[in-house]
Amino acid sequence: MAQKKPKRNLSALKRHRQSLKRRLRNKAKKSAIKTLSKKAVQLAQEGKAEEALKIMRKAESLIDKAAKGSTLHKNAAARRKSRLMRKVRQLLEAAGAPLIGGGLSA
């Protein structure tokens, strides 16, 4: 006799659907963070201090929100913010752009 096909566990199917939604949401957040970070670095390389600092603050805000919602670990978020700020500051100093009022200390 042919064996019956095993039934699906409904809770497992629901958890899988939830994980797929969560994955897309987390991926979008991380992508936005990376995009803004790259844009801030690019503007800093061009010596556009005002715009670079503005974009950097937006990226910093998104990083904090991602850490709050457990998309990023809090230490990973702190590391990303630190590296971004250091990179932007170094590039702006190299370009000779003023850092006053930007929130970047030496």
Curated annotation (Swiss-Prot):
Residues 1-32 have a biased composition (Basic residues). It comes from the Bacteria. Residues 1-33 are annotated as: Disordered. Keywords: Ribonucleoprotein, Ribosomal protein, RNA-binding, rRNA-binding. The keyword RNA-binding applies. GO terms for molecular function: small ribosomal subunit rRNA binding; structural constituent of ribosome. One of its GO terms (biological process) is translation. Belongs to the bacterial ribosomal protein bS20 family. This is Small ribosomal subunit protein bS20. It comes from Thermus thermophilus (strain ATCC BAA-163 / DSM 7039 / HB27).
